[in-house]
Amino acid sequence: MAGNAAVGVLALQGDVSEHISAFESAIQNLGLNIPVVPVRKAEQILDLMALAIPGGESTTIMRLIEKNGMRNIIQNFKGGIFATCAGMVVSARDLINETRFTPLDLLDITVNRNAFGRQRESFEADLQISGFDTPFHAIFIRAPVITRAGPDVTILAEIPQGIVAAKKGKKLILSFHPEISHDLRMHEYFLKDMLG
């Protein structure tokens, strides 16, 4: 574990308050005492045990990561990474049909940023997630999918269009928005996996 055992939520754009609330509830459910903090400055990342990269608009998030001098710090961060939707996009090694920015290469994955096109911008699905006893009701909003995962990446859930949940070590990458689903299992899974 790195630094001062806090979970940070990248607070540049996206579902920041929803992730903070979900992590606080998950931490309480697990009987842990870990603070959850918004992260707006690069130096804050150094003191974290985990960093959440929330959904939002991937081009904007990446531009703000660059502007705030966070790229190298996030790429070299040894704690956990919890990335959702646009967070998945910026965490990828490669992107399909996206040349406006270079992603962070946190996992050996290729991501299709607009996998469902404009006609299916938002939908919900009950996912069978590896290790979960019952389906997880996932909310997808203009969601990306993983089209290729490297051999060191564990696939946790798929739909016909591609992979929607994957992990490598302490990094958990999701296409959907668990922070708005009222089901804390993804946040709890991440915390338990990271602390285990």
Swiss-Prot record:
Name of the molecule in the record = Pyridoxal 5'-phosphate synthase subunit PdxT
Per the record, its GO cellular-component terms are: cytosol; glutaminase complex
Catalyzed reactions per annotation: aldehydo-D-ribose 5-phosphate + D-glyceraldehyde 3-phosphate + L-glutamine = pyridoxal 5'-phosphate + L-glutamate + phosphate + 3 H2O + H(+); L-glutamine + H2O = L-glutamate + NH4(+)
Name the residues that bind L-glutamine.
Answer: 56-58, 113, 141-142
How this chain assembles, per its entry, is:
In the presence of PdxS, forms a dodecamer of heterodimers. Only shows activity in the heterodimer.
Gene3D superfamilies, alphabetized: 3.40.50.880
Catalytic positions? 85 (nucleophile), 177 (charge relay system), 179 (charge relay system)
Pathway participation: Cofactor biosynthesis; pyridoxal 5'-phosphate biosynthesis
The UniProt entry's coiled-coil ranges are none
Q: Which domain of life is it from?
A: Archaea
Q: What biological function has been recorded for the protein in this entry? A: Catalyzes the hydrolysis of glutamine to glutamate and ammonia as part of the biosynthesis of pyridoxal 5'-phosphate. The resulting ammonia molecule is channeled to the active site of PdxS.
Q: Name one GO molecular function term.
A: glutaminase activity
Give the family, as the similarity comment puts it: Belongs to the glutaminase PdxT/SNO family.
Q: PROSITE patterns given for it?
A: PDXT_SNO_1, PDXT_SNO_2
The family database entries (CDD domains) matched by this protein are listed as: GATase1_PB
What gene is it encoded by?
A: pdxT
Entry keyword set: Glutamine amidotransferase, Hydrolase, Lyase, Pyridoxal phosphate
Note one Pfam family from the annotation: SNO
What are the recorded Gene Ontology BP terms? Answer: glutamine catabolic process; pyridoxal phosphate biosynthetic process; pyridoxine metabolic process
Organism in which the protein naturally occurs: Methanospirillum hungatei JF-1 (strain ATCC 27890 / DSM 864 / NBRC 100397 / JF-1)
